[in-house]
Amino acid sequence: MPLNIEDKKAVVAEVSAQVAKAQTIVVAEYRGITVGDLTKLRATARTQGVYLRVLKNTLARRAVEGTPFAGLAEQMTGPLIYGISEDAVSSAKVLNDFAKTNDKLVLRAGSYNGNVLDAGAVKALASIPSRDELIAQLLGVMQAPVSGFARLLAAVAAKKAEGAPAEAEAPAA
């Protein structure tokens, strides 16, 4: 059923609102994917905070017009699914991970920070840890010396409680 002009304006407004908040847009060709697989992809995207939508390319071009993602308009041909995310790597990760398990989804292009990315650059972007993962790694690195020192103090306290002289442990390098 074709959309009337009011429906088209509503779709463009909805997608434009998502694009305004986005850091990354990834475009992939979905030709030949079953409805069940597409439903799984949508569920995964939803849990990762990625806005995933199949759009008419003309409506998508209008939604990105006048934004840092306008350069992506040249890549908008054929049956495409659009992944839009506020996180820099989420949409690339979701679509790239799905493309690894389903060869019918082909990454076409993306846009990040005002730059248009080819499929290889989108895959490279997907390999970068997310902000939350980076914070967790940083906290782990910062916490390691403190937890080692706490274990050392606990060992010294245990030795003293036993009545044996405590041996100094060599500091970890």
Swiss-Prot record:
Keyword rRNA-binding listed: yes
One Gene Ontology molecular-function label: structural constituent of ribosome
Family stated for the protein in its record:
Belongs to the universal ribosomal protein uL10 family.
Q: What is this protein called?
A: Large ribosomal subunit protein uL10
NCBIfam families from the UniProt entry: PRK00099.1-1 (NF000955)
Answer whether the UniProt record assigns the keyword Ribosomal protein to this protein. Answer: yes
Q: What are its GO biological-process terms? A: translation
Q: Which organism does this sequence originate in?
A: Cupriavidus metallidurans (strain ATCC 43123 / DSM 2839 / NBRC 102507 / CH34) (Ralstonia metallidurans)
From the broadest rank down, the organism's phylogenetic lineage runs: Bacteria, Pseudomonadati, Pseudomonadota, Betaproteobacteria, Burkholderiales
Q: Name one GO cellular component term.
A: large ribosomal subunit
Print the keywords alphabetically: Ribonucleoprotein, Ribosomal protein, RNA-binding, rRNA-binding
The record, for Pfam families, names:
Ribosomal_L10
**Quaternary structure note:** Part of the ribosomal stalk of the 50S ribosomal subunit. The N-terminus interacts with L11 and the large rRNA to form the base of the stalk. The C-terminus forms an elongated spine to which L12 dimers bind in a sequential fashion forming a multimeric L10(L12)X complex.
Main function:
Forms part of the ribosomal stalk, playing a central role in the interaction of the ribosome with GTP-bound translation factors.
Q: Which InterPro entries match?
A: Ribosomal_uL10, Ribosomal_uL10-like_sf, Ribosomal_uL10_bac, Ribosomal_uL10_bac_type, Ribosomal_uL10_CS_bac
PROSITE patterns associated with the record: RIBOSOMAL_L10
